[in-house]
């Protein structure tokens, strides 16, 4: 007879394989739709460019001019993605003028920089302007600090280089290199022929920032005409001599300090938070993970790192800055293509020299603006600066973000915060866990908000709506989220609803959840009017009341999380499939390698759970883009649900997907059953392979405690490929699989690992007959 096998949607690991009968027990890269399992969609990188660091924050918005942008916050930088390019807007921490700061060693690519001003840390970024040559090297542009010492740090001369394929090839980098300097090349892809990575070449025909290479000192320049190249290339130059101090007068511009890529546990007395653990016992603590919060204020962006200040990026200046010219006069006059209002802070950059009176990296303020022409002052509303002397090169207004407090109209802007949120409905800017008014002390339970429609005014007054309030339940605010009618605020022990009241209170907080937990600021997702979040031992939801979310994977998930890496956990929606995703580090892992999904649309609204393996660092499901976006460990963004394969790095790879059922009785009673064939029910619709296929495996058991029968088959096979053979007039595939299996219980598995394959399972049928009882099985033989 033929028996139809129909299993419930979702994966259940809360019980034994047998207790979870009629369901599914394990999965990887499989989802449920309309009650049946299918392989998830593929992913494609959005461009071939990459960013530096691990991305932990994504935000999508559109400017007044219709430009679609994404804020990308990493542990090393902050970028704005536009058209596949990652534009660096990392704010500046400080700028100083140094005299002969560089020390070189002959044949070495390491340069030591002396700067007694301090404030820099390992992995920070610094840009140099105005340097003169030292032993064949003119050190210009941006570098990452590799090692710090007392009043010194080191950098490597390795910098990006572009190669123009020609006869001979032309190389362009941020450094100026003298003829006969030794260099090596490296790449993330392939170098054009005949260039070979890590081979010594010599600079010839140098001219400014361009040069050519020869295989020998003073030899003929290398020809790359007709060749091809891929990836990002780097050139590393070696000093031609040893000098303790050189480079002339140098302007050094430092970006804000970088942060760690993952959580580094610390141990010892006082390392943990106050009140944590047993009195007198050293608790574990962590170096702070670099987490960003961000949101658009109109077309501009407000952003900041957890535990840091608030920054503001002005969309008027653009993602690459704005070119300008200076009329040397008393005062100097700047002419550019954009209109900037008085009080706007600006920083200037150049590939040459600014006139006397102005310097690279210094914050100036627009004064006497008439639109696209204005003067500059050292302070907001101050006297315009007189310029003199000469100038050279091309000048630009920097595209980098500024401290919000640096704007001329700024008043009592918080100097430190743990989370930023912009109210879409009421146009307030909120800071959570910030410093009190007129104090530098951070209060982890304090909420402050700006005046309505004014991101710079944080001073409460009878004439505005700026204000603050302090929450009482918990020890710190973790995160916040804008929902339809309220702002939800999570502390480490409670959930509050923040609602707009109007003057004079402006905003009020109501406790809506107690004795809860939340693992990180990014562990909350909002979909279909409901907020979902991951706690430290369970999942929750809030739909007007706080509830524990039933989870069929609770024990499986929470027994396999690296609790030291809680802060890395993040969530996101995939609303096209009614899904909430959480990504986490499995036990012993310091990087994200697992995910768990709650599908709130399955099981008649009760939802379904499933899980799998995937390495991601951030997620964004935006209605302003065609696909959900994710950040990867390949330092790029990928579109999910795009295609059926893995194209994270530019090379198309197959996605391995599988699902295994729980054990189910083949037939009620104590009789064994002999199965001679299985009739698959599957569709390969959407596959791009010519003959897509997967493997169906049947796993027989005598009873729930016996383990799988070995050998699994009786003189035949227990698995076979299922292949599509036609698509018209109907989709045809392997109609039946012949097996020889004798068992009382069984589990089944379907998997695929080939390129171009996607599938959805239906209801398989088994052709079987009764086959007596087995001796030694605990029942009488027969």
Model-derived segments and spans:
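Small/polar beta-strand repeat architecture
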Residues: 1-3, 14-15, 19-20, 88-292, ...
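Beta-sheet repeat architectures centered on beta-propellers
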Residues: 1-96, 255-265, 269, 273-274, ...
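A short beta-strand motif characteristic of beta-propeller blades
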Residues: 43-49, 277-281, 402-411, 464-470, ...
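Beta-strand initiation motifs
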Residues: 86-88, 318-321, 399-404, 456-463, ...
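Hydrophobic or amphipathic alpha-helical targeting/insertion segments
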Residues: 88, 298-313
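Beta-rich globular "head" domains
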Residues: 120-130, 175-182, 340, 344-345, ...
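Beta-propeller blade signature
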Residues: 444-453, 594-601
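Surface-exposed extracellular loop regions of Gram-negative outer-membrane beta-barrel proteins
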Residues: 487-513
């Amino acid at each position: 007879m033929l028996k139809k096998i129909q299993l419930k949607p979702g994966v259940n690991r809360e019980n034994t394989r047998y207790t979870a009968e009629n369901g599914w027990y394990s999965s990887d890269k499989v989802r449920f739709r309309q009650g049946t399992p299918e392989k998830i969609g593929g992913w494609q990188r959005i461009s071939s460019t990459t960013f530096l660091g691990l991305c932990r924050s994504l935000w999508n918005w559109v400017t007044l001019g219709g430009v679609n942008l994404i804020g990308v916050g990493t542990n090393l930088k902050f970028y704005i993605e536009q058209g596949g390019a990652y534009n660096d807007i990392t704010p500046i921490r400080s700028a100083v003028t140094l005299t002969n700061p560089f020390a070189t060693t002959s044949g070495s690519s390491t340069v030591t920089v002396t700067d007694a001003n301090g404030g820099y840390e390992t992995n920070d970024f610094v840009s140099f302007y105005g340097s003169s040559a030292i032993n064949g090297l003119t050190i210009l542009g941006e570098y990452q600090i590799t090692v710090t010492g007392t009043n010194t740090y080191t950098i490597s001369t390795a910098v990006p280089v572009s190669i123009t394929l020609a006869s001979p090839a032309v190389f362009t980098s941020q450094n100026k290199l003298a003829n006969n300097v030794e260099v090596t090349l490296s790449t993330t892809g392939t170098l054009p022929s005949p260039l070979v990575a890590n081979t010594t070449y010599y600079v010839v025909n140098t001219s400014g920032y361009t040069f050519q290479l020869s295989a020998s000192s003073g030899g003929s320049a290398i020809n790359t005409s007709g060749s091809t190249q891929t990836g990002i290339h780097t050139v590393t130059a070696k000093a031609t001599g040893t000098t303790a101090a050189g480079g002339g007068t140098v302007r050094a511009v430092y970006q804000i300090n970088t942060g760690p890529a993952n959580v580094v546990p610390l141990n010892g007395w006082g390392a943990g938070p106050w009140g944590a653990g047993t009195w007198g016992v050293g608790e574990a603590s962590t170096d702070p993970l670099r987490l960003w919060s961000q949101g658009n204020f109109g077309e501009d962006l407000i952003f900041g790192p957890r535990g840091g200040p608030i920054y503001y990026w002005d969309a008027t200046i653009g993602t690459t800055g704005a070119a300008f010219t200076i009329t040397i006069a008393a005062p100097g006059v700047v002419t550019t293509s954009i209109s900037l209002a008085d009080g706007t802070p600006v920083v200037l950059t150049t590939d040459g020299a600014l006139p006397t009176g102005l310097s690279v990296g210094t914050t100036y303020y627009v004064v006497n603006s008439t639109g696209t022409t204005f003067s500059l002052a050292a302070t907001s509303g101050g006297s315009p600066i007189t310029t003199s002397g000469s100038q050279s090169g091309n000048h630009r207004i920097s595209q980098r973000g500024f401290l919000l407090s640096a704007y001329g109209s700024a008043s009592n802007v918080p100097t430190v915060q743990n989370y930023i949120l912009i109210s879409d409905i009421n146009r307030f800017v909120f800071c959570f866990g910030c410093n009190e008014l007129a104090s530098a002390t951070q209060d982890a339970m304090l909420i402050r908000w700006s005046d309505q429609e004014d991101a710079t005014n944080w001073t409460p007054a009878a004439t505005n709506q700026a204000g603050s309030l302090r929450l009482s339940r918990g020890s710190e605010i973790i995160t916040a989220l804008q929902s339809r009618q309220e702002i939800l605020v999570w502390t480490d022990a409670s959930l509050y609803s923040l609602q707009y009241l109007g003057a004079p209170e402006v905003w009020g907080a109501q406790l809506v959840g107690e004795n809860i937990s939340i693992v990180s600021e990014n562990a909350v997702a909002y979909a279909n009017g409901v907020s979902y979040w991951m706690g430290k031992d369970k999942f929750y939801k809030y739909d007007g009341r706080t509830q524990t979310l039933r989870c069929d994977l609770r024990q499986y998930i929470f027994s396999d999380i690296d609790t030291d890496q809680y802060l890395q956990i993040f969530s996101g929606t995939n609303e096209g499939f009614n899904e909430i995703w959480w990504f986490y580090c499995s036990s012993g892992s310091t990087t994200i390698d697992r995910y768990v999904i709650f599908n709130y649309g399955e099981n008649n609204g009760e939802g379904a759970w499933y899980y799998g393996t995937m390495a991601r660092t951030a997620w964004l499901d935006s209605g302003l883009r065609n696909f959900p976006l994710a950040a990867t460990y390949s330092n790029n963004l990928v579109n999910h649900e795009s295609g059926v394969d893995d194209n994270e790095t530019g090379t198309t790879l197959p996605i391995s997907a599988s699902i295994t059922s729980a054990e189910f009785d083949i037939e009620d009673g104590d009789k064994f059953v002999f199965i001679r064939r299985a009739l698959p029910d599957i569709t390969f619709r959407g596959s791009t392979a010519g003959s897509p296929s997967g493997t169906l495996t049947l796993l027989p058991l005598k009873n729930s405690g016996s383990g799988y029968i070995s050998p699994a088959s009786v003189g035949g096979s227990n698995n076979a490929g299922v292949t599509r053979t036609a698509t018209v007039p109907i989709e045809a595939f392997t109609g039946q699989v012949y097996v020889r299996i004798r068992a009382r219980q069984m589990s089944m598995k379907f998997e695929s690992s080939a390129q171009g394959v996607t599938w959805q399972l239906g209801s398989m049928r088994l052709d079987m007959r009764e086959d007596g009882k087995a001796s030694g099985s605990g029942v009488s033989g027969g």
